Swiss-Prot record:
NCBIfam families: ATP_synt_delta. One of its GO terms (molecular function) is proton-transporting ATP synthase activity, rotational mechanism. It is found in: Cell inner membrane. Keywords: ATP synthesis, Cell inner membrane, Cell membrane, CF(1), Hydrogen ion transport, Ion transport, Membrane, Transport. This is ATP synthase subunit delta.
Amino acid sequence: MNKGNLIENYAVALFNNAMVDNIQDKIFEEITSINRIITDNFDIREFLFSPIVNKNDKINAVNLLAKNIKISTIVQNFLLLLVKNSRTASLSNIVDAYNTLLYESKNIKIVQVISANKLQPKEQEWIKSLIEKELNQKTEILFDIDSTIIGGIVIKYDSMLQDYSIKGSLEKITKALKTVNVAA
């Protein structure tokens, strides 16, 4: 089984478990919070991701963490399953896949917008409204910054890429110039 399917399977299992009690949003908040704690804390991350650390010690750590931050039994059992199956290092990817499932269940499309500089709130709202009008669907926009695009924006969703950046335009011009046959 490839890693993408494995991650998706874990996310779907967690999502389906959450659907039983209609707590998909609550589970997302909890699993995102846990992921942030693990990601932000080097010692916890190394402890949980290390193949050298005994699984029983990891299980005890997850149980202690669950007790201290008061997470649901569903999330606690899910984390224990990841520990038992040596999949804790995949947690961030599982959270991303769960997020996608959550938005799909609400008929909301996740769209990534990349700009060279931080966009002002008015600009973000304007871009969001244009994208929602084009897609005829509600969206969750993830705004990212990549100074290498020089200017403009790049829009990504599903398998689509719309490049309105200066870098993209320059690359298209360069490619076009390379195809021109100039006789000497």
